[in-house]
Each structure stands twice: as C-alpha cells, then as structure tokens.
C-alpha cells in the first residue's frame, strides 16, 4: 500500500470516536517496531519525524525511501502517513513534501497570530496541491522536543483557533491545552473545557502533543471532544533505552549492536501496541 495523507485517517477517527497515534521515528529500529506493531493490530499509523531526527537519519529523502522499503519487505498493508513534526518554516515543510512526505505540521505558534496565519496559509496552499495534509499549532506546548523548547504552557485561545482554521484551510489543529513534550512533573492538567469549545467551533480533528504520561482516563475524555491524533515519542524512547541498558548491564561482553538494538525494538513494539489499544485504533485500518 502506498503512503497516504493523514486527512482521511483523522476524519474517520473523529467520526468514530478513536484516535490515531503519531509515533516518532528516530532510526531504523523505531520504524520497524512501529510498522510491525501497527500491522499486527491492523491500525492506521502516522510516523512522526522531527527536523532533528531527519538530520540524524541523513535527510527527508532517506527517511521516505527507508519507510517505503520497510513497507515492501514487511508486507505492510495498513494506511501509513509520514508526517513532519514541528516544521519550523515554509521552506522546511516544502523540503519534506518534495521528498515524499505525505503530511506536515507547520509550527508558527511562536510568531504573532497574523504571521502564524500567513505562514500556515502558504504551507497549506503548497501542500494541498500535492495532496499532502497540514497540521498547525496555536498556543505553547511546554517542555522540549529536539530543537523546540518552551519554558511554559500558553493555552490556545478558542476564538483564534476558529479564525486560524477559517483563514488557512488546515486539516488538523494542535491547540496547546496543558500537555508537554517529555516527562511530566506531576499530573498533567488538560483544558477539557477549551478542548470541547475548540472542537465544536472548528469542526476539525484536534491533535494532542506530549501524549506520554497522560493518564488513560484523560485520553478517553479527550477523544469525544474531537482529539483524533495523539503524539507519542518519549515513552518509546524510555522503553528502548531501558532495554539497551538491561542487555549491557547483564552482559559486559556484548558488542554486537543487534544484541541490544533487537530488544530495544521489541520494547518499542510492545509500547506502541499498548498505545494503539489505549487510543482505540486496533482494527481501524481501511
């Protein structure tokens, strides 16, 4: 099956009361694990790629070809989107699209509102010509993800969200509502009232960044309010790092990378399977 945009995935998720996971890839093993877990659960999946991860893996083109090769060799038949996570500029989004990405996020949330609108609209116009879906952000998601650092959380304004959607034609909206990138310090406090208002006023699938560490009860509460995409990265990184440490701590003679990266891959796979079940994505592939 060829790579697809995430637009139809998210519309179906919103209409049918589940969420599609975006699982960020950092190397070959992450990609194998996420694809295999999704295929075994018959779940559509979004492979997230930050600009930092893209640099680490040599570039957008390399990533697209790696994913396409794995889909062929692993006989992946579920819908798969490759999504640029936190694209920093129109130029970066264009570069990803031209390399074969099927979805992009333009994150101009740090800019003044009118500038955010203008940049986002420019990305949408280019992306939609190529059949590529676009996600945008309003407010500030706290924490750090690669080069994206935010000291605090600034909640999205529901009226600005509606205006951004109307003026740009985006396919999905990531309003900052209390989630953070990386591990949480204490219990997360999501703005469900704002989430419901934004979901109703925009009619768009909403995106929840910083999905690691959000309690299942909050995930289940967010989905009926329009959350159709949930991003996960830290949880997979923690699981894979623990698996590597366990192998190396148990046997100081190990040097073959397959001996420790294999268990890391399995740890990611099991983590993703758990998230797929939690988000209600199992058997939703079409």
From Swiss-Prot:
| Pathways per UniProt | Carbohydrate degradation; glycolysis; D-glyceraldehyde 3-phosphate and glycerone phosphate from D-glucose: step 4/4
Q: Which reaction is recorded as catalysed by this protein? A: beta-D-fructose 1,6-bisphosphate = D-glyceraldehyde 3-phosphate + dihydroxyacetone phosphate
For this UniProt record, the keywords arranged alphabetically read as follows: Glycolysis, Lyase, Metal-binding, Zinc
Query: Any idea which positions bind dihydroxyacetone phosphate?
Result: 182, 210-212, 231-234
Which CDD domains does this UniProt record tie to the protein?
A: TBP_aldolase_IIB
Q: Where does Zn(2+) 1 bind?
A: 86, 181, 209
Statement: the UniProt record of this protein carries the keyword Nucleus: no
Q: Which residues cross the membrane?
A: none
Highest taxon, organism lineage: Bacteria
The positions annotated for binding Zn(2+) 2 are: 107, 137
Which cofactor(s) are needed, names only? Zn(2+)
Q: EC number(s) of the enzyme?
A: 4.1.2.13
Q: Which terms in the Gene Ontology molecular function aspect does this entry carry?
A: fructose-bisphosphate aldolase activity; zinc ion binding
Residues holding D-glyceraldehyde 3-phosphate: 50
The record's active-site residues are: 85 (proton donor)
- Give the top-level enzyme category: lyase
Give the cofactor note text.
Answer: Binds 2 Zn(2+) ions per subunit. One is catalytic and the other provides a structural contribution.
Gene Ontology BP terms: fructose 1,6-bisphosphate metabolic process; glycolytic process
This protein's record includes keyword Metal-binding: yes
The protein's role, per its UniProt record: Catalyzes the aldol condensation of dihydroxyacetone phosphate (DHAP or glycerone-phosphate) with glyceraldehyde 3-phosphate (G3P) to form fructose 1,6-bisphosphate (FBP) in gluconeogenesis and the reverse reaction in glycolysis.
> Could you tell me which NCBIfam families the record lists for this protein?
cbbA (TIGR00167), fruc_bis_ald (TIGR01859), PRK08610.1 (NF006376)
Instruction: Name the protein family.
Output: Belongs to the class II fructose-bisphosphate aldolase family.
Full protein name: Fructose-bisphosphate aldolase
């Amino acid at each position: 099956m060829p790579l697809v945009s995430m637009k139809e995935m998210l519309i179906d998720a919103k209409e049918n009361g589940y969420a599609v996971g975006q699982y960020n890839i950092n190397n070959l093993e992450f990609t194998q694990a996420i694809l295999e877990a999704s295929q075994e659960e018959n779940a559509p999946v979004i492979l997230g790629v930050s600009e930092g991860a893209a640099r680490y893996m040599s570039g957008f083109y390399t990533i697209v070809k790696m994913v396409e090769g794995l889909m062929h060799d692993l006989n992946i038949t579920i819908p798969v989107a490759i999504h640029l996570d936190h694209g920093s500029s129109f130029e970066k989004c264009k570069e990803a699209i031209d390399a074969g990405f099927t979805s992009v996020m333009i994150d101009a949330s740090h800019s003044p509102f009118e500038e955010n609108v203008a940049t986002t609209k420019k990305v949408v116009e280019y992306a939609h010509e190529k059949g590529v879906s676009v996600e945008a952000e309003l407010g500030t998601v706290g924490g750090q993800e690669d080069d994206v650092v935010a000291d605090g959380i600034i909640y999205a304004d529901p009226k600005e969200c509606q205006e951004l959607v109307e003026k740009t034609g985006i396919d999905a909206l990531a309003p900052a509502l209390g989630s953070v990138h990386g591990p949480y310090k204490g219990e997360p406090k999501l703005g469900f009232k704002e989430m419901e208002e934004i979901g109703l006023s925009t009619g768009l699938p909403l995106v929840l960044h910083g999905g690691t560490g959000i309690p299942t009860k909050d995930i289940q509460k967010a989905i009926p309010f329009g959350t159709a995409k949930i991003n996960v990265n830290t949880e997979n990184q923690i699981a894979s790092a623990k698996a590597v440490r366990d192998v190396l701590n148990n046997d100081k003679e190990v040097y073959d990378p397959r001996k420790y990266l294999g268990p890391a891959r399995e740890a990611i796979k099991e983590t993703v399977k758990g998230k797929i079940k939690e988000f209600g994505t199992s058997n939703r592939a079409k």
